[in-house]
Amino acid sequence: MVSVKIISQEDDMITVLFKDSDRALLNAVRRNLMGHIPKMAIDTVRFQMGTYDQCVKCEHLNPAGVARRTAGGTGCSKCEAAFEKEDEDYIVWETNYAIPDEMIAQRLAMIPVPTDIEAYSFEESCPDCKDLVDEDRGCPTCNMIYTLRAFGAKGGRTITARDLTFLGDDSGNVPEAYRDIPITTLHEGQMIELWATARMGYGVNHAKWSTTAGVTFEPRQIASISNDKRAKILFDMGLRISKKDFKDGKLEDVHKVSDLKKDLSLIHI
């Protein structure tokens, strides 16, 4: 009977030992880990396009030219401040940046967002959406909405996953470990505004829904000392593994065996 033992476990990595198994079973486990575990991921992105005059006083965005005194405007639509001089009364922002929208959408899709399989459903099985056509599906029970509004700066400003805002409680925010993932760079006069919708999916359909990366397996190997004199020569070369790691002439620790193999391969080179 197959037995499973956890060798090591960290926040983002786990090593498992399978006994009495074969490659076919392990490959099936690998494929299921990568492609058949439900995960939330950004699937659609709506970009807001246009040019805006931002009020220096209240920071409100007005449609370009509408509020300017030279165009017959009456000022900011929020605080009614007069728009007479650019950079003094208002700042012009345009949704124009170097990276295409399609590439930004792809980057957003690959940013890990929290997955709560108990709080969210697949759109296909959502109680409120399952009977609707695909175009009409999407509700708070099966979708997570993120917004992004960011402005450039002189010399350039990198926009990251930290700038994404989840429309809900803090549990939906991008995890701290991934908040520095870059999305694009904005320069003076450039801005970006978008709404991103995340939904549940499987990695078999797209990599953005894959819950794991780099799932591999290899036969377990055990290192043994057959010649103490020759082994001493190796240990004197500053390997990460020493003789004290061997018990009864054998090294069974999976990670230490891997380190020994890497060290020996470098010596061979």
Regions inferred by a protein language model and the residue ranges of each:
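Protein-protein interaction/assembly regions in multi-subunit complexes
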Residues: M1-E59, R68, G72, C76-L266
